[in-house]
């Protein structure tokens, strides 16, 4: 392969060509960072967390493709991934994941000890998640914990502590991740049933759409409660109302369970995360 072809293969392995995963991981981290700093996060900490999010999401994708290397060739959406086609070897994927994880760890070394210690379970969750689809009926919940660890790390980095509020935000984000990743799982539902792996879309069964809606409502309800505790203003609650409207739009997209529409609904969650961050930002500025 030429250099450009290999670079393209590595970009696809780490999903740099599809940044939606990075954004969905970044938004709750930014929520936590802004709330922890009351709207004035340390610029160095902000840069470290943005870069760390990109590195760890990319590492997680490489690990995911390694874990699914025997499954992906049998799923229409994933059969052209670099590991599934043999363009990249399993050894290369592991080296990429290890290298990116090491870079992410080195990145946080200037931060306090608590943040560094929290990075250990965060890394273990990211590495182990792809394997939960073999035995755990709700792997999306496990992913929700993994995708939420940026929140306590943000509080630790900014304030030196992890207050109960941080864990409340973790709980909210957990339900959001279950909601949007179940939408994602609906895209591959037919293939996943044939292969025999486990997903929340399969576990919810005929209540899949209702389960997604319930998780979204729970997510927004917990954020509303967090806003009350923090005495947030109109911009925050206005953002939550807009997010609720976006959730209703998603419901109209997934109610017929058409794979293409479910995938669009999944992508739609980037707007939810962005709107909530905008509400937090404006609420602290105005």
Curated annotation (Swiss-Prot):
CDD domains: PT_UbiA_COQ2. Pfam families: UbiA. It comes from the Bacteria. Pathway: Cofactor biosynthesis; ubiquinone biosynthesis. The chain crosses the membrane at residues 20-40, 43-63, 83-103, 135-155, 160-180, 209-229, 234-254. One of its GO terms (cellular component) is plasma membrane. The keyword Cell membrane applies. It catalyses: all-trans-octaprenyl diphosphate + 4-hydroxybenzoate = 4-hydroxy-3-(all-trans-octaprenyl)benzoate + diphosphate. Keywords: Cell inner membrane, Cell membrane, Magnesium, Membrane, Transferase, Transmembrane, Transmembrane helix, Ubiquinone biosynthesis. Its EC number is 2.5.1.39. It is found in: Cell inner membrane. InterPro entries: HB_polyprenyltransferase-like (IPR006370), Prenyltransferase (IPR039653), UbiA_prenyltransferase (IPR000537), UbiA_prenylTrfase_CS (IPR030470), UbiA_sf (IPR044878). Its main location: membrane. Its cofactor is Mg(2+). It is a multi-pass membrane protein. It is an enzyme of class 2 (transferase). One of its GO terms (biological process) is ubiquinone biosynthetic process. Disulfide bonds: none annotated. One of its GO terms (molecular function) is 4-hydroxybenzoate polyprenyltransferase activity. Belongs to the UbiA prenyltransferase family. Catalyzes the prenylation of para-hydroxybenzoate (PHB) with an all-trans polyprenyl group. Mediates the second step in the final reaction sequence of ubiquinone-8 (UQ-8) biosynthesis, which is the condensation of the polyisoprenoid side chain with PHB, generating the first membrane-bound Q intermediate 3-octaprenyl-4-hydroxybenzoate. HAMAP family: UbiA (MF_01635). This is 4-hydroxybenzoate octaprenyltransferase.
């Amino acid at each position: 392969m030429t250099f450009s072809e290999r670079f393209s293969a590595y970009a696809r392995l780490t999903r740099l060509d599809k940044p939606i995963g990075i954004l969905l991981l970044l938004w709750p981290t930014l929520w936590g960072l802004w709330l922890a700093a009351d709207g004035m996060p340390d610029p160095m900490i902000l840069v470290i967390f943005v870069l760390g999010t990109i590195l760890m999401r990319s590492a997680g994708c490489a690990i995911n493709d390694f874990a699914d290397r025997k499954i992906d060739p049998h799923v229409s959406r994933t059969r052209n991934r670099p590991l599934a086609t043999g363009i990249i070897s399993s050894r290369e994927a592991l080296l990429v994941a290890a290298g990116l994880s090491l870079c992410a760890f080195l990145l946080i070394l200037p931060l306090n000890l608590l943040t560094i210690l929290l990075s250990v379970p965060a890394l273990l969750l990211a590495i182990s998640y792809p394997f939960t689809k073999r035995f755990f009926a709700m792997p999306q919940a496990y992913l929700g914990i993994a995708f939420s660890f940026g929140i306590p790390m943000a509080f630790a980095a900014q304030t030196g502590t992890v207050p109960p509020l941080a864990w409340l935000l973790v709980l909210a984000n957990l339900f959001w991740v279950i909601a949007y990743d179940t939408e994602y799982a609906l895209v591959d539902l037919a293939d996943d049933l044939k292969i025999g792996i486990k997903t929340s879309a399969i576990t919810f069964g005929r209540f899949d759409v209702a389960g997604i809606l319930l998780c979204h409502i729970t997510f927004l309800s917990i954020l509303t409660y967090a806003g009350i505790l923090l005495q947030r203003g109109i911009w925050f609650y206005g953002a939550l109302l807009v997010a609720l409207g976006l959730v209703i739009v998603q419901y109209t997209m997934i109610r017929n369970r058409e794979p293409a529409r479910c995938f669009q609904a999944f992508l739609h969650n980037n707007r939810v995360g962005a709107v909530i961050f905008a509400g937090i930002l404006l609420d602290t500025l105005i």
